């Protein structure tokens, strides 16, 4: 398929998606930003507005500029209605054959609250769970940066870069980053130098605000693409890399405690289940998500297949134990329910050309590679996702598609 044919096919698919928006979502809001964002994360706070039907949420994102334009780490606030919107025939655009502005009532507002100068594009930015005012970021340099965003004005007064801390220990750029949920101030980063660095931002620092790693781990023969603390254990973490390896580590040991190779190409991302101490998932260039059980790492527990291109992000839902999502170069975010996985030997299992039963939703609102996404911690089926064509999207799966006794029971 030529590039022109590919663009036409993408455009056609997007038009079809737009026509079906009212049936698939309770909310879809697209923000066309000036520059693409490689990173996005909801923050944990939520504020009820004066209008009781709305709530205000914050998110972290960044810029990827070109031509010498200043990059920024950004905090934005998003106001979203709490009521399920009604299907409105008046929103049908007969000329374009689509519904417009669905879920974008007067309560849906998106405003930039804080902009912080950043040296180069923001590869990844994540807040510290124990103090969400503290944000770590990565860019195209060796260093990792720590910001307290309460110490920065809403707009920078000049072009000077003013992080609260610089973490110095890598010898190359990177994307992987993970804060500990159980130990305040502890951070892991992965880099193209193949190293994993463990930091304690509360440790002694130099006069110039620099910190060196508490420890460094070498377990990959090429780029270390991602790293993640275990959600429930103090010292357990995992890393993945271009050598196709999944390594499981103990912070107190210098070597991986377990190593597995379950993908046929580079592994880009890793996530631990926040409800189960044994289950984790990895996403790969081979277009699959692998599920793993730490009690038996000799083989994958299951392979999730429905992406058409490499996967860049995977994340378990913070609300439901069996739900996770993944995104990548096929412009899609796929939501999976692993409790729906069928026995591969069963005659009722999905064929290779059908949608597997574990796929419960496909978000097709993007027209370019989905660089990152984030589950909203306060709204169970709401996700923010970003793509390479300057779109940030907030979308909420229709309650009619996911409402069931199972989900209601899990939320009690």
Swiss-Prot record:
One of its GO terms (cellular component) is nucleus. This is Probable histone-binding protein rba-1. It comes from the Eukaryota. Belongs to the WD repeat RBAP46/RBAP48/MSI1 family. Keywords: Chromatin regulator, Developmental protein, Nucleus, Repeat, Repressor, Transcription, Transcription regulation, WD repeat. PROSITE patterns: WD_REPEATS_1, WD_REPEATS_2, WD_REPEATS_REGION. WD repeats lie at residues 117-157, 169-209, 219-259, 262-302, 306-346, 365-405. It comes from Caenorhabditis elegans. Signal peptide: none annotated. Binds directly to helix 1 of the histone fold of histone H4, a region that is not accessible when H4 is in chromatin. Interacts with zft-11; the interaction is required to suppress the activation of non-neuronal genes in neurons. InterPro entries: G-protein_beta_WD-40_rep, Histone-bd_RBBP4-like_N, WD40/YVTN_repeat-like_dom_sf, WD40_repeat_CS, WD40_repeat_dom_sf, WD40_rpt, WD_repeat_RBAP46/RBAP48/MSI1. Core histone-binding subunit that may target chromatin assembly factors, chromatin remodeling factors and histone deacetylases to their histone substrates in a manner that is regulated by nucleosomal DNA. Plays a role in regulating cell cycle progression. Required to repress the induction of vulval development by Ras signaling. In association with the zinc finger protein ztf-11, negatively regulates the expression of non-neuronal genes during neurogenesis. GO terms for molecular function: histone binding. Pfam families: CAF1C_H4-bd, WD40. The keyword Ligase does not apply. GO terms for biological process: cell fate specification; chromatin remodeling; nematode male tail tip morphogenesis; regulation of DNA-templated transcription; regulation of neurogenesis. SUPFAM superfamilies: WD40 repeat-like. It is found in: Nucleus. Disruption phenotype: RNAi-mediated knockdown results in delayed cell cycle progression. The keyword rRNA-binding does not apply.
